[in-house]
């Protein structure tokens, strides 16, 4: 045998023919080429030299070398992502050719042509689908050139969805043409696979879910074959497999088993209507069975098998069943009801529920059960006593009834379930209790009951009488119908398992009362079956009454709150307690028990009628009466819910809690009073009343019983306490204001509610315990002047009512408003919860100046740098290797555009890196400037800026953004020697240049600055950085600001600093007046400087300082006695620099127009020597805003990111700003320089600005100059600090002319006096300011208001 096997497996090498040799060698080479091609495609790198890129001097990254890179680039260009399928198709073709090499059939050219057409259709449609639906790969189209052509052709015609559908259809047809497969066969094949998978899974699931172990049957077979000689192991395995297969076949072929499986997996419930009901014994369920009959609680028709309504006695079938069960039938625990059923005689389950006590069923020794009385909190009300609770009717709750009688198990079969069923014990016998009549309660509406109800816990008594044990005798050989008994047993087990897994729907809208669990009745000896059946009728009635009382009991009990639920499955098996469904009794059955429910339709009609009556009654009542009724109803519901929740112990617990809280409150108040008296005993002001414990007598719970008004009452006397009424008012936390102690007014007293709890003391910070808080007379404002904010810890806050006298009792000086309080330090408490909004708009955060509290004056002359955010201590090092790689890449990209250049140096900065290029001889820098966008694309960067000229170097700069941008902090720019050593008070910092060095400028040398950039480019942050740098450099006597902020957002935060000449101007008319005042101030300063013989403001201040050192101040040479109220001749003082900042210059130009342009032009031309400097910022850098007149006098400009090169030329007179990166990236064109410098602006947070502003506010208040924004001085000519513009020389003559002619016109004055139009217009404006003529009307005419002169 082994020789034959060896001879069959010998492999002989047969020689192939020449044609076969050539074919197989060719197939091997083609397969290797496909592998090489796949490697080249997978390792493709766009930087390798290829068909689309020729110049490269670096190593090739492609695994296929230069040919692989070239071929991969070509395939990607033609086919896109479908190029990856080409090697797979090649390998598949080789396999097909090798499989069909032995067939010598003739060639069907028609079939070949169809296959070629199919291949062409598949290739075209695949590329088109990839181009429409897939993302591009590298810089190739996802479908290649083929897909791009198809997608561009189909998109206008069919859109993307229609094109995709059409290409899919063509692809399906091409697959059929190429393979010859029918789509019907493909669908059948796919369906067959799917069904096989589902069949395998379902069969495996069914086999796994069978919880009956097959080993128990193996034991039987082993017992049968004990006497037989042991077979071989192979025979035993085969015999066991055949037997198991036969059993499985019989199991699934049994019609009763199939019906059981259908019942198990159908998802139906036991109470569904069906033709045949299967019980645990495999026969149709009896109609009078409560659990398995399928009768529903909603079935209204009469049922002749109803054990409650058909008039037949229940004792007859029960006696017969009990007698039969005692001999042959087994007791199954699969149909245990959920609702409490009366146990058998002798069973006394103890239910841990305080409301209802269950009594045993009357038997031979026991009488009728007695239901425990309802708790005191249980109040039976008539149905629909409250119309607003009509939506929750009491009959919507299922009322429990007693289940079907339970039968005892035979001793022979009861032992089989001992391991699965819970251990049952025999209770002790008790004497017969006294018979009492059972009261019948009407169930209450469910709206007053809580929704959660824990089930009662049943305590099983200790067993005293065990059951008689009987050994089970198993026959040596199974009887004739043993397999049928086994199938019947397994069917019964399957039905129990089906009852186990019935789905239980969740309640949706109505609150279902709890279903108390039932204790499984113990086994009863057969001799007592008739007696038990005889006493079952009375037991059912008493159980129904007990169930009705349990349904009407309160739905929440503290006694059973933490009890475990017995309806928990603890293993596999239907014998454990589980939530089975019980048929809900009908109204007719409940009527037979004595529980009568009204008709639902009648109750609904009554509820609707009550709601209509309530609505009509409410329509006639006033709002106050409706509100009072609503509060009373809320109070009643709250009291009722509390009584239902806590039962009869609610009032007692409340009183005990009140006593405990009162004692704890008194102890805490005493300790707090002792500590406060010890702290402030010797420091209380005269007339102040001592500390009282009554001041702390408040608690959050008192709001529930407080009926007083919520707003504080202002009465001269002490308000008596009012008797509160318990109302569950919605909690509205109000801040508690502590009334300051007054020496004359009586001490305010707070209302004391009746339920004190733990006090909430007001802890005060001992910052200034000596100085009392100033008292203010505020008869119209209910808020105290110095509040102490405190938020209670409880969610319900008290609402104390305090009093404040409307008028002083006597004319005491304490009620006057003090000019400067001694130490008005308000003592704020940290709120633990956000306070409720107040009725008044007086809030610190709504103040224009913010918090007006006096702050501690700093000791340093200038703000500290600690107010600013420090830069990070760790700085990321420069990656020189990455910069070298980028330099080589720049050279390569320039070489692609036929530009020979070498990177000789690079300068890394925080935001960008500048590469210095050494161009080849004859290469113009303009060529690189024109390629800026192409270079940005090829280098994969956001923007590239080309610097054609680098001062001092023969190179061209190429600025590229860094991959990781760093933040420039203001603190690190201010903390450098260049800023500290600059003596000018107008020194400003801009940021850092590309090398990381700080850029510091002097506004006095600029002398004016124009800032422009789009929204979000960092323009406002740059202006804030310049303002903060001047605040860190100059005192208020050195620099003063006039801030114009049309947006009312950016510059308004500086309101209140001492550097301001006037408030932050937000009205454009006031802005024009402020600019006009600046022009007048410039003229006044020029007069003073000319009188002193100096050329600028610095020389003027030096003269003033020199005269002060000499002790001979210089008098004002232009002062006249009538100019001011000064008695002595005023002297000249030091003049500060004035910086006029305009945040949105374009809005100012649009609103006011030409007048502002003229004023700005005059300031830009002449204001430098007078110490007045302009900073103009705008978001719209257009020629109508930044006119040539303004640009000619403002040489210093800063350009942030703009949208186009035209805007860049408008600002800088050259391009470059359109290539900036934003977020503070700017081009700074300094004075006496034509080449802008790229600067990365310093970042300033809002918190830093507020910190510096608060620091300057603590140093002093601003001294505003009157008349800067007023109209009278703007038109009348008054300007300067204390002077005005003189009237025109022809003013008197022009007034005489106008009053005589009674006609005021500019042209008339111009012709009469032969003067220019501007001078005539100025004279008319002066007349209007003096009130001689009126303003222009809608038609441009003016009325003469002055009377005519006397003749």
Curated annotation (Swiss-Prot):
The chain crosses the membrane at residues 25-44, 75-98, 116-132, 163-179. GO terms for molecular function: ATP binding; DNA binding; DNA translocase activity. It is found in: Cell inner membrane. Residues 357-482, 559-589, 602-871, 1264-1283 are annotated as: Disordered. Signal peptide: none annotated. Residues 602-614 have a biased composition (Basic and acidic residues). InterPro entries: FtsK/SpoIIIE/SftA, FtsK_4TM, FtsK_alpha, FtsK_dom, Ftsk_gamma, P-loop_NTPase, WH-like_DNA-bd_sf, WH_DNA-bd_sf. Residues 385-395 have a biased composition (Polar residues). Residues 996-1209 form the FtsK domain. Belongs to the FtsK/SpoIIIE/SftA family. This is DNA translocase FtsK. The lineage of its organism: Bacteria, Pseudomonadati, Pseudomonadota, Gammaproteobacteria, Enterobacterales.
């Amino acid at each position: 045998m082994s020789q034959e096997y060896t001879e069959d497996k010998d492999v002989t090498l047969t020689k192939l023919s020449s044609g076969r040799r050539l074919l197989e060698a060719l197939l091997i080479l083609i397969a290797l080429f496909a592998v090489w091609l796949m490697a080249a495609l997978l390792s493709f790198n766009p930087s390798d030299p290829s068909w689309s890129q020729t110049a490269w001097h670096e190593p090739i990254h492609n695994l296929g070398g230069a040919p692989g890179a070239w071929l991969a680039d070509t395939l990607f260009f033609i086919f896109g992502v479908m190029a990856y399928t080409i090697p797979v198709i090649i390998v598949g073709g080789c396999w097909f050719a090798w499989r069909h090499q032995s067939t010598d059939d003739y060639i069907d050219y028609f079939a070949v042509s169809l296959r070629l057409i199919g291949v062409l259709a598949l290739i075209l449609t695949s590329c088109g689908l990839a181009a429409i639906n897939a993302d591009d790969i590298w810089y190739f189209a996802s479908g290649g050139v083929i897909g791009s052509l198809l997608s561009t052709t189909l998109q206008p015609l069919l859109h993307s969805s229609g094109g995709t559908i059409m290409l899919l259809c063509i692809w399906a047809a091409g697959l059929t043409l190429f393979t010859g497969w029918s789509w019907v066969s493909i669908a059948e094949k796919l369906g067959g696979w799917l069904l096989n998978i589902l069949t395998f899974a379902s069969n495996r699931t069914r086999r796994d879910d069978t919880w009956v172990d097959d080993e128990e049957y193996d034991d039987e077979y082993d017992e049968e074959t004990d006497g037989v000689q042991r077979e071989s192991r192979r025979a035993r395995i085969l015999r066991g497999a055949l037997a198991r297969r036969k059993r499985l076949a019989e199991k699934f072929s049994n019609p009763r088993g199939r019906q059981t499986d259908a019942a198990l997996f159908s998802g139906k419930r036991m109470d569904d209507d069906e033709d045949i009901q299967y019980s645990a014994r495999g026969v149709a369920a009896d109609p009078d069975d409560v659990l398995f009959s399928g009768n529903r609680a909603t079935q209204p028709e009469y049922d002749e098998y109803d054990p409650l309504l058909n008039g037949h006695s229940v004792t007859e079938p029960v006696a017969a069943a009990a007698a039969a069960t005692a001999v042959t039938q087994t007791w199954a625990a699969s149909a245990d009801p959920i609702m409490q059923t009366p146990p058998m005689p002798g069973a006394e389950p103890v239910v841990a529920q305080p409301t209802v006590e269950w009594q045993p069923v009357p038997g031979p020794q026991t009488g009728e059960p007695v239901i425990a009385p309802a708790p005191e909190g249980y109040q039976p009300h008539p149905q629909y006593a409250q119309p607003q609770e009509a939506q929750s009717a009491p009959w919507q709750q299922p009322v429990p009834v007693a289940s079907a009688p339970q039968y005892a198990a035979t001793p022979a079969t009861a032992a089989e379930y001992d391991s699965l069923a819970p251990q049952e014990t025999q209770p002790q016998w008790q004497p017969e209790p006294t018979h009492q009549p059972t009261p019948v309660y009407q169930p209450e509406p469910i709206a007053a009951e809580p929704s959660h109800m824990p089930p009662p816990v049943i305590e099983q008594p200790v067993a005293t009488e065990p059951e008689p044990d009987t050994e089970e005798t198993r026959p040596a050989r199974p009887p004739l119908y043993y397999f049928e008994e086994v199938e019947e047993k397994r069917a019964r087990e399957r039905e129990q398992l089906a009852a186990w897994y019935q789905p239980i729907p969740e309640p949706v809208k109505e609150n279902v009362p709890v279903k108390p669990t039932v204790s499984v009745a113990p086994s009863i000896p057969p001799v007592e079956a008739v007696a038990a059946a005889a006493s079952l009728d009375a037991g059912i009635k008493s159980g129904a009454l007990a169930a009705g009382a349990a349904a009407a009991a309160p739905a929440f009990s503290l006694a059973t709150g933490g009890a475990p639920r017995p309806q928990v499955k603890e293993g596999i098996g239907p014998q454990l307690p589980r939530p089975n469904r019980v048929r809900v009794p009908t109204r007719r059955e409940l009527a037979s028990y004595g529980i009568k429910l009204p008709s639902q339709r009648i109750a609904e009609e009554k509820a609707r009628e009550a709601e209509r009556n309530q609505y009509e009654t409410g329509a006639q009542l006033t709002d106050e009466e409706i509100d009072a009724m609503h509060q009373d109803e809320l109070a009643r519901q709250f009291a009722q819910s509390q009584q239902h929740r806590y039962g009869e112990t609610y009032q007692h617990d409340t009183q005990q809690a009140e006593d405990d809280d009162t004692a704890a409150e008194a102890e805490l108040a005493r300790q707090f009073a002792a500590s406060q008296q010890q702290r402030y005993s010797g420091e209380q002001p005269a007339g102040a009343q001592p500390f009282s414990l009554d001041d702390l007598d408040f608690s959050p719970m008192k709001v529930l019983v407080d009926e007083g008004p919520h707003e504080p009452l202002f009465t001269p006397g002490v308000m008596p306490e009012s008797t509160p009424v318990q109302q569950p008012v919605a909690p509205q936390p109000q801040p508690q204001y502590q009334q300051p102690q007054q020496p004359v007014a009586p001490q305010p007293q707070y209302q004391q509610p009746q339920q004190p709890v733990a006090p909430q003391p007001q802890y005060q910070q001992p910052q200034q315990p000596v100085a009392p808080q100033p008292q203010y007379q505020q008869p119209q404002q209910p808020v105290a002047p110095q509040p102490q904010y405190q938020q209670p810890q409880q969610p319900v806050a008290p609402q104390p009512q305090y009093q404040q006298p409307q008028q002083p009792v006597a004319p005491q000086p304490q009620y006057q408003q003090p000019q400067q309080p001694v130490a008005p330090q308000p003592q704020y408490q940290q709120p633990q919860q956000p306070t409720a909004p107040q009725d008044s708009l007086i809030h610190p955060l709504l103040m224009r100046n913010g918090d007006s509290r006096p702050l501690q004056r700093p000791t340093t002359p200038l703000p500290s740098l600690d107010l600013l955010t420090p830069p990070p201590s760790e700085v990321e090092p420069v990656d020189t290797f990455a910069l070298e790689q980028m330099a080589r890449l720049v050279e390569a990209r320039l070489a692609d555009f036929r530009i020979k250049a070498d990177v000789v140096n690079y300068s890394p900065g925080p935001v960008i890196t500048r590469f210095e290029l050494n161009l080849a001889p004859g290469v113009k820098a303009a060529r690189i400037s024109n390629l800026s966008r192409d270079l940005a694309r090829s280098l994969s960067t956001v923007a590239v800026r080309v610097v054609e000229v680098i001062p001092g170097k023969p190179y061209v700069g190429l600025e590229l953004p860094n991959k990781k941008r760093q933040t420039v902090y203001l603190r690190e720019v201010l903390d450098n020697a260049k800023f500290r050593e600059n003596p000018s008070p107008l020194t400003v910092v801009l940021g850092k240049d590309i090398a990381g060095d700080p850029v510091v400028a002097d506004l006095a040398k600029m002398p004016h600055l124009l800032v422009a950039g789009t929204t979000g480019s960092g323009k406002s942050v740059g202006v804030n950085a310049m303002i903060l740098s001047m605040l860190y450099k100059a005192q208020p006597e050195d620099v003063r600001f006039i801030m114009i902020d049309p947006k009312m957002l950016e510059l308004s935060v500086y309101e209140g600093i001492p550097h301001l000449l006037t408030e932050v101007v937000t009205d454009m008319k006031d802005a024009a007046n402020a600019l006009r005042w600046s022009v007048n101030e410039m003229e006044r300063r020029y007069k003073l400087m000319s009188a002193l013989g100096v050329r600028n403001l610095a020389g003027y201040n030096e003269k003033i300082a020199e005269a002060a050192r000499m002790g001979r101040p210089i008098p004002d040479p232009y002062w006249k006695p009538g100019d001011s109220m000064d008695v002595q001749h005023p002297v000249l003082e030091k003049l500060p620099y004035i910086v006029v900042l305009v945040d949105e210059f374009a809005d100012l130009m649009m609103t006011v127009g030409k007048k502002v342009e003229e004023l700005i032009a005059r300031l830009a031309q002449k204001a430098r020597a007078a110490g007045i400097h302009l900073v103009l910022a705008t978001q719209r850098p257009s020629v109508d805003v930044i006119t040539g007149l303004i640009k000619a006098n403002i040489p210093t400009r800063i350009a942030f990111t703009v949208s186009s090169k035209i805007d860049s030329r408008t600002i800088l007179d050259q391009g470059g700003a359109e290539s900036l990166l934003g977020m503070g990236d700017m081009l700074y064109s300094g004075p006496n320089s034509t080449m802008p410098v790229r600067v990365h602006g310093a970042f300033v947070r809002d918190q830093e600005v507020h910190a510096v502003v608060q620091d300057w506010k603590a140093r002093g208040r601003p001294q505003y100059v009157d008349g800067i924004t007023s109209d009278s001085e703007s038109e009348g000519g008054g300007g300067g600090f204390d002077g005005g513009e003189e009237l025109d020389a022809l003013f008197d003559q022009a007034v005489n002319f106008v009053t005589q002619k009674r006609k005021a016109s500019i042209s008339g004055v111009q012709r009469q006096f032969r003067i220019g139009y501007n001078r005539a217009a100025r004279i008319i404006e002066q007349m209007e300011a003096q009130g001689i003529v009126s303003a222009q009307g809608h038609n441009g005419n003016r009325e003469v208001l002055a009377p005519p002169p006397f003749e």
